[in-house]
Amino acid sequence: QELQEMLDPYLDAQGYRGEYQLPLAAFLRTASAREILSRYLRNLKAIYSQQERWERLLGIQQRLVILLPDAVEEIRDRGLALAQLDYIRPAVDDMRRYIDEVPDASDFEEIQAQLIELEQQIKHH
């Protein structure tokens, strides 16, 4: 009851009152170990990306790809980290997989342009 009273102002502000009111349990759902770990890794990912710590970021991306095998954006992001570290061929593989699997992605053209640039680098070596 006390928790519900503390939440009421927030619920009012978000429009979750009246006919749209959700039971308190909906807000207190237990997170799975996978959800907790992926949240932790994504927080580290944001930190390392912001700090441009590419080697550490790559380690996080490797873990995210394993933990979330269906999350193709994590494969894309691993490819971007690989490119920053000049691991061109694996970066190309990841980016190609991303655009092949998500041809309607909002960043398709940007990733495709980076992919073309990386493929040019391979041809010149």
Q: What does each of the following model-derived ranges do?
A:
Residues 1-125:
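A structural boundary/capping signal
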